[in-house]
Amino acid sequence: MKFKLDKYKLIHWLNIRKVTKHKFLLECDTGLEQMDLESSKMFFEISSSSINNIVNYLSLKEDQLAYSKLGHDEIGFIFQSKEELYKTKRLIKREGFDFYNYYTLPSPKGYVAPVILDILCPNEKLPKLNNGHFEAAITINLGPGPINGRWGKQINKLNFSVLESNLDDQTSWITGSSYFEPSYCPHTYSLASSQPAKILSYTVANTLDNFISDFNKLSQDQQINYEDSISKPLVERIISNQMSLLGFTEKTLAGTAELPLDIVSSFIKGDFDNLAMQLIKNLCSIMNLDFRVLLQPEITGDALGKTIFSVENSIKSKRIYKNIEWASAASSINSPDLTGSFLKVDNESDGTDLSNLDFMYFSKNSHYLVTSGNILFVSKNGNEVIEKLKLSKDDSLWVKPYQSHFFIGRGSLIKMSNGEGVDYTNDFSLGNLFDEQNTVKRAFKDNLGWGYD
């Protein structure tokens, strides 16, 4: 089987390794009579032995050079019909009885996708808790009935609550209550009446996934040192780690900054109450520390970290954007990439004249579930040709970041987004770039070599 070698990734790594294109082609057996790195080709098909030669030459892993663009990257979306959704059904049993049916919405391979759950645990049974998971989540009641949410062993207002469905015909596109769930929050659900009920839950990839995966590789000695490090509060830990990285002690930092020791001591402990922002920035500058990482957000939610958003709260949030009515679902500033919205489409058209359509695009991945009506999904493919797709209840879509699209017709959807591949921490890195706009433009399909050919 041929390996698809990504030309831009190859050139990028040649630059990192300080190897000219000419030297690479001269010294490394690519298995090709000619590999024109100046051509418009995006990838080269080579043998397994050839890619082995290249990764050994550049000290890389194969996946670091693999061409990964797929069909959905070009058209910008993945569609899943209701029939395909139903085929993903799998039953979960707990304590000997049917507990949930799970269904999975579409997403690219390797991505996290929202799931729909049929809540099967009857109202008279106390649902058994799970152990929670590292990833945060938003969960929305799809109705038609209410559900019980349980988040702790004791049964009280904090640990046990009804997530209502929306019984108002005028606002039924807002299907029900929703809530944000933090990391490792135990949770479970049961029916809260004789009515059936479903939920839509989006358990998203965490921006710390790679960080945690790498730390699971620590040796015993490394783990001891890491656990010693995290015994300090986060801000103090960040400052202490940066000081040790550059060989600063409390005294030498105070001496370099020409500041009294007690002021520097307060800074190191994260006690900023009596410190001016400019002083904090100056100390960070000495240590080459981005001061923004010291500005910690407030941890929101209740005593368990969860945030429940009622139907009434969603109704109050209604607004118009791009000729579509929107309403908010639960969210948390502690997980800014994870968002949920209810959308009402009421802009009937036969779809023949789309010349003046005000397309929308978003900086994050978007998952859509149609909850009512008949809707026309309109999009642009890679050649700027208009694509149309008819949608009805329980059809679903994944739409790529920056993909132009729109909805026409009468109906409703739920939209969920996360930052997988485009998370908000990128914005901090972009903010650190010199000449940010031109730098990012250059990085897109950068075909320039090291410059010493």
Question: Which residues are covered by each model-predicted region?
Answer:
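A short, Lys/Arg-rich alpha-helix, primarily the initiator
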Residues: M1-E27, D221-F248
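Helix-turn-helix DNA-binding elements, focusing on the entry/boundary residues of the two helices
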Residues: L10, K21, I51, E62, ...
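The DNA-contacting recognition helix of HTH DNA-binding domains
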Residues: K21, G31-Q34, E62, E250, ...
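Recognition helix of helix-turn-helix/homeodomain-like DNA-binding domains
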Residues: D29-V55, S68-L70, E258-L275
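A short, N-terminal "cap"/entry segment at the start of jelly-roll beta-barrel domains
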Residues: L60-D118, D228-S229, Q242, M277, ...
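Short, conserved beta-strand element in jelly-roll/cupin
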Residues: D118-P122, N130-N156, F342-S349, D358-N381
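Short acidic-glycine-tyrosine-enriched beta hairpin
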Residues: R150-C185, L376-S404
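Double-stranded beta-helix
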Residues: A192-V235, R410-D453
